[in-house]
């Protein structure tokens, strides 16, 4: 998955992180808190704060333990709440899975340049297919267009209840 970006869902002003399949057409919108949305946006934009934020601290802890974050995976949705796991290889080479909120997992993955995965059953159940022309405009950073506006309107119309699973 790739992080398309952080958006604000209207009219609730709730931040969402929008993930997209790398080799597909499905999107996965995940509602997140404002602090986590900021942490994700900072990582996407390469903003380095003067002091470590929580996710920077998490990265430092993993690295200081001679471990590696190999990937993060959005695994499920339960009662409208997304679940995720951090996939870590520890100093002895053992694979360890740690439960996490998707927002924290994504923020950490962006900082460590780790893969972001989504369970295929989850994408089958709650992934959203967006028409190719609209999706391409959303991923194209060259400027505003009517297609981008249509994409934003689509985002404005979806809500967390659509993903109650």
Where are these regions (language model features)?
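Divalent-cation
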Residues: 1-165
């Amino acid at each position: 998955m790739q992080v398309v970006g952080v958006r604000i869902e209207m009219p609730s002003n709730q931040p969402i992180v929008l993930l997209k399949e790398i080799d597909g057409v499905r999107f996965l919108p995940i509602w997140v808190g404002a602090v986590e949305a900021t942490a994700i946006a900072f990582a996407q934009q390469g903003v380095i704060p003067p002091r470590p934020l929580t996710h920077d601290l998490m990265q430092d802890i993993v690295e200081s333990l001679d471990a590696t974050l190999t990937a993060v995976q959005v695994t499920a949705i339960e009662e409208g709440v997304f679940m995720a796991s951090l996939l870590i290889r520890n100093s002895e080479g053992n694979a360890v899975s740690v439960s996490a909120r998707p927002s924290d997992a994504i923020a950490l993955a962006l900082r460590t340049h780790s893969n972001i995965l989504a369970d295929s059953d989850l994408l089958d159940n709650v992934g959203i297919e967006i028409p190719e022309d609209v999706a391409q405009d959303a991923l194209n950073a060259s400027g505003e267009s009517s297609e981008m506006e249509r994409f934003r309107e689509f985002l404005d119309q979806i809500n967390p209840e659509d993903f109650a699973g």
